[in-house]
Every structure is written in C-alpha cells, then in structure tokens.
C-alpha cells in the first residue's frame, strides 16, 4: 500500500534518474478542455492517441481520462494502452504527475510537488487546479509506490537531470514571483537538491520565447547523457529566441557539471517560427487566462521529445527543419529509433510531447 513519507528523497538515499534509463511505463492524461484545445479537443485527442500508441510499441502506457471521455479514449487508443478513469483539470502529465526517484537497490518513490497551474492567481492558466494537484498522489497510489508531498510549487517540465548529480532549470520559471515568492534562489536550490537528490543546479536565464509556462527548461533543452545536452537553437540573430539560446549556450559551455565534466552542447535547430492561424484561434473557446490569438507566435521546439525504451518520440510540424531535427537526434541517439508524430495540435495547447508524458523508471 502506498504511503506518504515524512523525510526527503536525498535523506533517504533517492535521486531522480536520467530519462534514458529503462522505464516500466509512461503516464499520460487525455485532453478535453475546450478553452485550451480547439474544436472540443477532437484534433488534439487524435494526436495524443498517436503519441500514446507510438510509445506503447516500446513500453507500457497508462492514459488517465475523465468519465465523460472514457469510451472515446478507449476507442482511439490501441488495446495495449491501459485506460484508467481519473478526474483531472487538463492534460499536462509532465507538470502534474509525480517525479519518480530511485535508490541504489532499484526501489522507486514519487515526489508530489504543489501544482498551481503555472502561476496560481498571478498569471496561472486556469482555475480551479485542485484535480491536477491530486494527480501525482493518485499515480503513486495506483502504482503502489510511496511518495513525498512537498510544500514547494514546481512543475516537472521546469527541471531536467542527468541522473548523475546535475539538474538544469531556468531562472525565468523557478524564480518567478508566481511560484515560490517567499523563497530565495538559495532556498529554491536547496529544495531541488533535497527532493531530486542532486548535487549541483545549473541555472539558465530564459526558456523558449513566448512560452506561457514562464520558460520551462524541457522546451529549451534535453539531456542526452551526463555531460551532454541538445539545445534549441537558431542562427537568426534577429529572432527573439537567438539571444535566449545564446545565453544558455554560453553558460553551458563554460560550466562544469556535478562530476566536473565539461558539458557538450549539440545545437537542435528550432522549427518555424510558427504562428497560430485565424482558423485555429477561432476554434478555441475564449477564456480570461489562456491567450490564443491569430498570429501569436507559438513556443515550437524539437527539444520537447520523449525518450522511450529504445526510441525517441519526436514532435514534428510539417516544417522545413523537421528532417534536420531527425538527423540531429539520430546522431546523438544512434541506438534509438526516431518515431515522429505530427504535433502541431499539442503545440497549439501550449506544449509538446515531453509535456504530456511522464516516465516511471523500472524497479529491480
């Protein structure tokens, strides 16, 4: 039976493993919000199904879905995808699900962060968010794993780790006054070390341009292995993303990781830029929080991919840089199959494949 722990992962000898380590399964949540997903979320649901079905070729997938959408999800998903009825507010499993940590014996536990919809009452994207804040605990209870409940606001997409002592994040997100305003940078870093079991935090100034999550690091870069990352890039110095990526590149290439390694940075050219069309904007129900206007630039990125067992599930956009992204990632993941999914519909909702997935590492 799952139980809540009163210590911290670091004190108990647990740490956040690298995402490339073997998984038992992947968790997702079915989309249905009509104020975030166009045309009643029908186009997004088809793409979520494509993502889940692609991952399910390599590892187990569990899809959480509201009771209203259970039959629809079951019909669109392959039979080897497990579907479980579970109340939710939206479908960003990376941000609301548990961060799974492990110890040297292969035991796993979950970290249940506080979720406030990317800002609470100071710029948050929807209200209420209590169902989403309960997702991490529910996942742990379904999986029968113990968990730590923190009093620290954090989304899973705002951190990346190399599984070997180093964590990457952005100041734009974690130091934003709408997350943990009463904590200093040093206190925030201490929380990351205690609950992710890391030794060093590498702070990057900014995420991807116009990212409504306040610059999540998982849209900016992905960790390939200890001492190696792929970084969203553009050579266009007039593009607002250029300065953001250049700042990150300069810090990464002049910083040693927790084990004293120089960090290798592989540039991953961004798509587009891509913009919301008038037709797409008109298909989304108007609300007071989430902005979806015609000609609004979207935070498109190829770094927002999922590492499955022996495969990379990569978002593509029908863009001229799609083939280059596949080639770049195949070069850094020579033993993985690159599975592409047309993912513009996820991008229209504000994120991409990494944002809608959460891995559960294998136990020994």
From Swiss-Prot:
Catalytic activity reported: agmatine + H2O = N-carbamoylputrescine + NH4(+)
InterPro entries: Agmatine_deiminase (IPR017754), Peptidyl-Arg-deiminase_porph (IPR007466)
Cross-referenced Pfam families: PAD_porph
Keyword Electron transport: no
Transmembrane in keyword set: no
Enzyme class: hydrolase
Any GO molecular function: agmatine deiminase activity
Active-site residues, Swiss-Prot/TrEMBL: 355 (amidino-cysteine intermediate)
HAMAP family: Agmatine_deimin (MF_01841)
Protein name: Putative agmatine deiminase
Protein species of origin: Mycoplasma capricolum subsp. capricolum (strain California kid / ATCC 27343 / NCTC 10154)
Gene that specifies this protein: aguA
């Amino acid at each position: 039976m799952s139980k809540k722990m009163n210590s911290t992962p670091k004190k108990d000898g647990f740490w956040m493993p690298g995402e490339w380590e073997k998984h038992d399964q992947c968790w997702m949540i079915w989309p249905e919000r009509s104020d975030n997903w166009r045309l009643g979320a029908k186009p997004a649901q088809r793409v979520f199904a494509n993502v889940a079905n692609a991952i399910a070729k390599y590892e187990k997938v569990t899809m959480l879905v509201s009771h209203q959408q259970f039959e629809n999800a079951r019909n669109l998903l392959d039979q080897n995808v497990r579907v479980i009825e579970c109340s939710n507010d939206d479908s960003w499993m990376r941000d609301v699900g548990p961060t799974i940590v492990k110890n040297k014996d292969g035991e796993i536990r979950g970290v249940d962060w506080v979720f406030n919809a990317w800002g609470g009452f100071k710029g948050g994207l929807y209200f209420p968010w209590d169902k989403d804040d309960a997702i991490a605990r529910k996942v742990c209870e379904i999986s029968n794993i113990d968990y730590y409940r923190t009093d620290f606001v954090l989304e899973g997409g705002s951190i990346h780790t190399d599984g070997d002592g180093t964590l990457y994040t952005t100041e734009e997100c974690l130091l934003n006054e709408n997350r943990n305003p009463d904590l200093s940078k040093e206190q925030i870093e201490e929380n990351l070390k205690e609950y992710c079991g890391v030794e060093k935090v590498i702070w990057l100034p900014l995420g991807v341009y116009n990212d409504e999550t306040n610059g999540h690091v998982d849209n900016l870069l992905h960790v390939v292995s200890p001492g190696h990352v792929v970084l969203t890039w553009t050579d266009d110095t007039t593009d607002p993303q250029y300065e953001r990526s250049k700042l990150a590149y300069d810090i990464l290439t002049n910083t040693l990781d927790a084990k004293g390694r120089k960090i290798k940075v592989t540039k991953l050219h961004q798509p587009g830029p891509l913009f919301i069309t008038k037709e797409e904007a008109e298909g989304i129900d108007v609300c007071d929080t989430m902005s979806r206007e015609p000609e609004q630039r979207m935070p498109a990125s190829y770094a927002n991919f999922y590492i499955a067992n022996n495969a990379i599930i990569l978002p593509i956009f029908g863009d001229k840089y799609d083939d280059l992204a596949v080639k770049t990632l195949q070069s850094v993941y020579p033993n993985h199959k690159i599975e592409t999914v047309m993912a513009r519909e996820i991008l229209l909702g504000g994120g991409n494949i990494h944002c809608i997935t959460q891995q559960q590492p294998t136990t020994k």
